[in-house]
């Protein structure tokens, strides 16, 4: 399984948007041929986010295919195989901005065998735009994507009932599909959902309001995206340490001789000079002496920024540790229940040995039990003795080393992890910690398990 990379996103623009709180991460999903890539292309085109040379390239490829107009889906179909097959098979990322907001957009695949890519695209999203073909209504893959959005606790879900022009802009068809969507969303516990009729091909209700849907009086898709609130700064401070920075050999200058900093990308919250922090899993405490961003010193840094934090005490901190707000740190656990979206073609069985990766920390783990699987037909949890590709199940894991974790419903950054093949290094599954109401989640023994 390939690891998607974030392309076409100016690093300075992303950092600036993250710092101001104007950045919105969105993902598109839906069944194959629902028009996801066309909708994204229309959104980019109508919001004037397409460069002239990009549009010229799309027009030329469209002409080569024998089309009479530009195929806007090509604006996001970045892989050669996508262009040849006409389907999105990986997550295509795009950065764009309007006067009101900056966006990182992930266009996810629709085929059921690529659900794992959809999990990747939705895992960091503030909003998921789910497309439903007005001719087909709610399908199993629609339910699957809604289940993934609910599982990943995506704060906002927008459902675009697309290709509404192909059912003659029928108010009755739209009303029936909207009712089905809201019923499924309620069963899955989707927190907030918006539904609107669209035609990505013609542009109805994407950027400009449609005159063909008088039965819909709500905002356009872009209007929704520009107005949705984000809660990116409300979580407690977390910084998974990616690198310990300390001069090797002779320091280039006296002031750097005793320099020691802990570099990483802030996963949640805000940190300020003077804040008390705790090092996890050891539990040692200190205060923030300084925050460095390149050659600049900052008084504070926020979620999404990559910084180096210096502490007032020479405590033991290593790659894989987490710096957390001292007054609001997660539990350090060695046993945990989690919802797991299984992404491997090889089934998951009890007693399987895997690696669990959380932030920058990777530990050995064993599957203690598989306690159920989500049935996408009736949205109930049924008994299961294994998880197959694209299954979503409840799994109990025993960890070889303590890991700081929290319930995913409380904190997406503290509650998310990956399961990795210990031999080949491939991603096997995405997990969401489920502690609330289970009575499970075994804390590690007091900090003696940390390094001495």
Provide a role label for each language-model segment.
Residues 4-113, 125:
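P-loop NTPase switch module centered on the Walker A-proximal segment
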Residues 39-43, 57, 117, 141-148, ...:
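Alpha-helical scaffold elements adjacent to nucleotide-binding pockets in ATP/GTP-utilizing enzyme cores
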Residues 101-103, 108-114, 122-146, 150-175:
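Conserved Switch II/interswitch segment of TRAFAC-class P-loop GTPases
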Residues 155, 167-236:
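Canonical P-loop GTPase G-domain recognition
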């Amino acid at each position: 399984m390939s690891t998607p990379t974030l392309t076409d996103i100016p690093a300075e623009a992303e950092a600036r948007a993250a710092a101001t709180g104007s950045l919105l991460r969105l993902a598109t999903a839906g069944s194959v041929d629902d028009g996801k890539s066309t909708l994204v292309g229309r959104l980019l085109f109508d919001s004037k986010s397409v460069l002239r040379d990009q549009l010229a390239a799309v027009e030329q490829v469209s002409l080569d295919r024998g089309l009479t107009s530009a195929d806007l889906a090509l604006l996001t179909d970045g892989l050669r195989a996508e262009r040849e097959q006409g389907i999105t098979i990986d997550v295509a990322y795009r950065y764009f901005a309007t006067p009101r907001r900056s966006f990182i957009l992930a266009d996810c695949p629709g085929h059921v065998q690529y659900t794992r890519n959809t999990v990747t695209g939705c895992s960091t999203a503030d909003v998921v735009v789910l497309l439903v073909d007005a001719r087909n209504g709610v399908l199993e893959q629609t339910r699957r994507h809604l289940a993934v959005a609910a599982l990943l606790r995506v704060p906002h879900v927008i459902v675009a009932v697309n290709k509404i022009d192909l059912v003659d802009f029928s108010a009755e068809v739209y009303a029936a599909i909207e009712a089905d969507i809201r019923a499924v969303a309620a069963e899955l516990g989707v927190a907030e959902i918006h539904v609107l009729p669209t035609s990505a091909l013609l542009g109805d209700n994407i950027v400009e309001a449609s005159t063909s849907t008088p039965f819909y009086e709500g905002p356009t898709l872009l209007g929704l995206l520009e107005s949705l609130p984000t809660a990116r700064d409300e979580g407690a401070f977390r910084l998974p340490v990616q690198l310990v920075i300390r001069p090797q050999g002779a320091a280039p200058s006296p002031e750097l001789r005793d320099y020691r900093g802990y570099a990483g990308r802030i996963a949640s919250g805000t940190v300020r000079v003077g804040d008390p922090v705790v090092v996890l899993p050891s539990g040692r405490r200190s205060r923030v002496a300084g925050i460095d961003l390149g050659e600049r010193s900052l008084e504070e840094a926020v979620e999404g920024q990559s910084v180096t934090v210096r502490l007032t005490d020479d405590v033991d901190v290593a790659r894989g540790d987490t710096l957390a707000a001292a007054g609001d740190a997660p539990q350090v656990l060695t046993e945990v229940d989690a919802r797991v979206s299984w992404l491997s073609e090889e089934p998951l069985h009890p007693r399987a040995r895997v690696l669990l990766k959380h932030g920058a920390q990777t530990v050995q783990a064993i599957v203690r039990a598989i306690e159920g699987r989500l049935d996408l037909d009736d949205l109930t949890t049924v008994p299961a003795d294994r998880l197959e590709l694209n299954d979503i199940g409840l799994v109990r894991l025993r960890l070889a080393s303590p890991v700081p974790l929290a319930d995913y419903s409380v904190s997406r950054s503290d509650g998310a992890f990956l399961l990795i093949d210990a031999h080949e290094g491939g991603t096997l599954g995405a997990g969401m910690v489920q502690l609330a109401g289970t009575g499970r989640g075994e804390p590690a023994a007091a900090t003696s398990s940390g390094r001495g």
